Amino acid sequence: AAAAGLKRCFLPLENLREGSVIGGIDCYGVSTLAELAVLLRGRTPLPEPAVFSEESLPLEETPDFSDLAGQELVKRATLLAAGGRHNILYIGPAGTGKSMIASRLPYILPAMSREERLSVSEIYSISGLLPPDRPLMTKRPYRSPHHTVTGLALSGGGQKPRPGEICLAHEGVLFLDELPEYHAATLEVLRQPLEEH
C-alpha cells in the first residue's frame, strides 16, 4: 500500500504492530469490519496511527565469536567466507566446534539493510514464524535443518505452499550439519539455488 502511494491502511488489530514497521503510511488497527465501516464513514475520529520504533524491540542474545577458544584457522576461514558472502564447508570429527562456529556466522555478517530486514520479516510473517514481540527481524536468520529434512521442506511448496529452509535462511545462514547423512535427492534440491547465488 505504501509503495502504491496510499496514505493510510487499516489492518486487523493483531497485525497492527507488524504493519507499522513499513513506514511511510499511517496504519490503523480494527477488530471487526463493522468498526472499519464506522471509521471510514467518519462517524468517529481516527485514532493516532501506530508508530513503530526499533528501540522498542526486546534485546536479542548475540553469541560472540570471540567466545570460541582455539580453532584459529577455522575462525579465520569463517571470517573470510562471511566477509565475501561465500559458502563454506567444515570438515572434521564430531565435537570440534563446527556447529558452534557456524551458529555464530549471522553475528559476524554485516548488519542487514532496512530492505533486507523487511524482506526477511515478510518471509517469517507468511511462514507464521515471526515472533509477536518482534515485528521486524533485525538479525540474520540461522537455519539448521536435521538431516532427515525432506526436499519439499528444504525447498518449500506443497499443497499449502510454505517457504522452505532455503527461503527461511534468506539473507542469513543455512547450515547443513552431517552433510553425508542427507539423502542425495534432498541435496539435489540445493543445486539451483547454489548455482544462482
Would you name each region that the model predicts?
Residues A2, R41, A69, L79-G83, ...:
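Signal for well-folded cores of large energy- and translation-related assemblies
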Residues H146-T150, R162-E195:
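Conserved AAA+/SF3 P-loop NTPase catalytic/coupling segment centered on the Walker-B
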